[in-house]
Amino acid sequence: HQKEAARRNVEALEAVQPQDLGAGEIGVRIGANWVPVEVYQQFMVELLTPNYYVRDRIRILRSEATGQWSIREKNADRSNVKANTTYGTKRMSAYHILEQTLNQRDVRVFDYIEDENGKKKPVLNKKETAIAQDRQELIKQKFAEWIWKDIDRRELLCRIYNETFNGIRPREYDGRHIRFEGMNPEISLRPHQINAIAHILY
């Protein structure tokens, strides 16, 4: 009897365990905090191929206190065409754009002009902003194409996602045991209707 009860308990637990989600069911927004820093670091290095001498200095960091992302030494790779042209602009490098993207911010380019009091004030440069935002969209697109390509990375991210977010299955209500005293016998309720009544009762 104990074995049978234990088996039933295991089956009941297995029945309520949510199915693990696969890569095709998981959306990864660039900058999502559940993605390890090393994954973003790898993406940056593979996309921008920084100069060998500065590669180890340019690091993506995340503040535990604020959740903000930053890229250290983002000005170190000045002669990189990918950073300055392909994925960046002459006014904003790809490292600056990636940092803003990780923080879910739209990039903007400002010119600073002096007012009548000699104080510098920022004025949005619409043309340069449009170019920078075009590069930002390109980086997002490249990230979406890249994120699931590597099998090891895919398995790692699926495991982290399922452990972090997919541990609780929404409660389902079973109303099969409910007796409807005095109800018109001509009326038969469908299973989902009975379960909905159970939801209200419990």
Task: Report residues per predicted region.
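Charged, low-complexity intrinsically disordered regions
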Residues: 1-167
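ASCE P-loop NTPase motor core, strongest for the SF2 helicase catalytic module
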Residues: 160-202
